[in-house]
């Protein structure tokens, strides 16, 4: 978007573009982020809830425009959020959507292999192949891979090969790496999710997610069925691939597992991303983080919002996503407790980010930080931030 506006820019990437979280997404492009609109109305009122919905609609439309003519497997699909037991939650969500001027349907039966209480359906959403999309999008852009930013001095980025001076800086590093501004180490935690790709499984003709955070998700990718689930807070125990494989054996006994992968998401305190000025004490420094597992529309919203802000323009969605908004939620207490436990735990292996005790992840054979989500290989190499360095001993 900055390129199209004629704004000079440089994008620096520590590794390779889309080599991290993006390559492991299930790439659902939808305004339907769980049962979110009833929660937003209760927390923020109709004004900011409406901003959130309009931002997601704008993001979906921008994808339609950009993907037109691209070979990126873009398909329009209906999206469903289902509940296993509480139909009342679905009714409340439909009512909230109607108040915001958006229509959804209640669906009683789904092409899933287990009974549900029902689902909220939204028509004409989309799915695609994010790597194919970025490969098309990145052609001709000013991108410098294998160029990690080691330090920010004002709006000058310091890299191993030199400095980049700019009028504005956008920090889009998944988990923000500057600790002294914005308190993101308290305002975020990370959550791991797992996916298996099944061959010889049915076409479910849509995108499905459980309203419960630890529930299952489904979508097809050509001749494969992608089943997601087994999630847990990073550094804690969860079902992971074991849970997914048990599910597949029970419900899709004729299917064959072709692939497996995992991803990690930054979770905000109130379910809304932090997009905008990094903090009230920093100027010309911006951030995009806390996408809460909905990175496709959230990243596009970030692109539209931040490209406006760095050009000095106003944006109609800025208020609801403001990183400086009040976020006094129960999760803040949980995050603080986890940090205290991690700092006080008697162990020799500690995260170089802020010193929390690391936990061994036996399913993925990694050292994981339960405080902020950094992860390391068995030999100590950093594979997930916010830590920026390897373990000194393993």
Specify the residue positions occupied by each region the protein language model found.
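Flavin-dependent oxidoreductases
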Residues: 152-220
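Rieske [2Fe-2S] iron-sulfur-binding domain
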Residues: 196, 346-394
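Conserved FAD/dinucleotide-binding core of flavoprotein oxidoreductases
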Residues: 221-257
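Glycine-rich active-site loop/strand segments that organize a redox cofactor
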Residues: 20, 24-55
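Glycine-rich FAD pyrophosphate-binding loop
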Residues: 4-24
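C-terminal catalytic lobe of FAD-dependent flavoproteins
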Residues: 124, 212, 241-246, 252-335, ...
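Flavin (FAD/FMN) cofactor-binding and adjacent substrate-gating region
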Residues: 35-42, 61-136
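Helical element adjacent to the flavin cofactor pocket in flavoenzyme catalytic cores
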Residues: 96, 119-168, 172
């Amino acid at each position: 978007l900055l390129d199209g506006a004629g704004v000079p820019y440089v994008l620096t990437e520590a590794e390779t573009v889309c080599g991290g979280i993006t390559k492991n997404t299930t790439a659902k492009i939808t305004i339907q982020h769980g049962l979110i609109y009833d929660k937003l109305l209760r927390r923020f009122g109709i004004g900011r809830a409406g901003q959130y919905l309009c931002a997601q609609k704008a993001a979906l439309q921008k994808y339609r425009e950009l993907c037109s003519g691209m070979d990126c497997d873009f398909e329009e699909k209906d999206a469903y959020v289902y509940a296993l037991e509480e139909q009342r939650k679905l009714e409340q969500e439909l009512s909230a959507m109607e108040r915001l001027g958006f229509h959804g349907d209640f669906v009683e039966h789904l092409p899933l292999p287990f009974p549900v209480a029902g689902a909220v359906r939204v028509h004409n959403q989309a799915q695609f192949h994010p790597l194919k999309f970025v490969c098309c999008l990145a052609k001709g852009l000013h991108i410098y891979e294998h160029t990690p930013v080691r330090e920010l001095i004002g709006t000058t980025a310091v890299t191993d090969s030199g400095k980049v001076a700019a009028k504005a800086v956008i920090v889009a590093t998944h988990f923000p790496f500057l600790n002294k501004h914005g308190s993101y180490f308290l305002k975020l935690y990370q959550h791991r999710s797992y996916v298996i790709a099944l061959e010889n499984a049915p076409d479910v003709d849509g995108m499905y997610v459980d309203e419960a955070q630890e529930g299952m998700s489904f979508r097809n990718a050509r001749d494969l069925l992608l089943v997601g689930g087994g999630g847990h807070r990073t550094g804690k125990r969860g079902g992971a691939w074991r849970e997914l494989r048990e599910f597949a054996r029970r419900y899709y006994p004729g299917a064959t597992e072709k692939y497996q992968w995992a991803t990690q998401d930054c979770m905000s305190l109130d379910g809304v991303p932090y997009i905008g000025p990094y903090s009230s004490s920093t100027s010309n420094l911006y951030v995009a983080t806390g996408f809460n597992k909905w990175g496709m529309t959230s990243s596009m919203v970030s692109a539209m919002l931040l490209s406006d802000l760095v050009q000095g323009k106003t944006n109609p969605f800025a208020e609801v996503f403001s990183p400086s908004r009040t976020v006094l939620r129960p999760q803040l207490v949980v995050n603080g407790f986890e940090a205290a436990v991690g700092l006080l735990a008697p162990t020799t292996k500690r995260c170089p980010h802020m010193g929390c005790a690391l936990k061994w992840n036996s399913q993925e054979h990694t050292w994981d930080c339960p405080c902020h989500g950094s992860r390391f290989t068995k030999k100590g190499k950093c594979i997930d931030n916010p830590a920026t360095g390897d373990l000194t001993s393993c």
